[in-house]
Amino acid sequence: MPSAASFYLPMGFGFYAHQWERSAAPERLAALGRRAESCRTLTSSNDWKDLASIYREYTKKRNGWAYRDEKSWEKHIDAQLLEGYIAVTYDRKGPSGYLFYTLDDRKMIASEMAFKNEAGRKALYAFMAGHQGSVDTCVWYEPLDDHSFRYWQDGAEHTYIKNRTFPFMLGRVIDPVIAFDGLPCSKEIKGEIAFQLIDSFLPENSGIYVLRAEDGRIHALKEDVFYDLKCHIEDISGLRLGSCLLYTSPSPRD
């Protein structure tokens, strides 16, 4: 994680997941939000299934988010309630979005935000906007594949809503062959590439690798051939891990 990056980076770890960190005055969010059918704050982990249904839809086809079962949800919720709050918004079909947040020094910090659709996102914006008078600034995080800022009114990007990238997940390839061999790819992709890898922390990984695309699969092997590319282990550790499908966000006009 970023807070411990100085410890992990020298060991060949690389950032492979980023998100947007956004901040704005609550009154600015009012123009972008739309009130939910209903909204409530959780007081216990008993309703974890409401959050889980939102989280599954939100993280589907996205990269870098953790898998959560019932126990991990209960632990996650209980930890949040020790120091902050959890808001859940609902539409006519059920839970639509949630927010983990704290209030401190006239600032609302939403450490986790998830929504099922654009209506859920707007409901969370409206919830944050509802804190006008009690906070001066709202800070929240959204996926890097989110392009809703293109539709914000009056050029909001970097103007009244500050928007910057924020890394949030580190990974490390231990065995390059195992990491790449068998990965799916488009059947239209054919050919191969050879690269020299340098791994100073695990020197047994250093060498020349060949990646070959055949019939929708990647085949990897380590062999002594002429190579096209030279890179360090942290370069390939920073590639997308887990689900690598690009996700098209719902249209903000929906």
Indicate residue ranges for each PLM-predicted region:
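Structural motif
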Residues: 112-115, 140-144, 197-199
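Conserved GNAT acetyl-CoA-binding A-motif
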Residues: 1, 133-143
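Active-site loop ensemble at the mouth of alpha/beta enzyme cores that anchors a bound cofactor
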Residues: 144-182
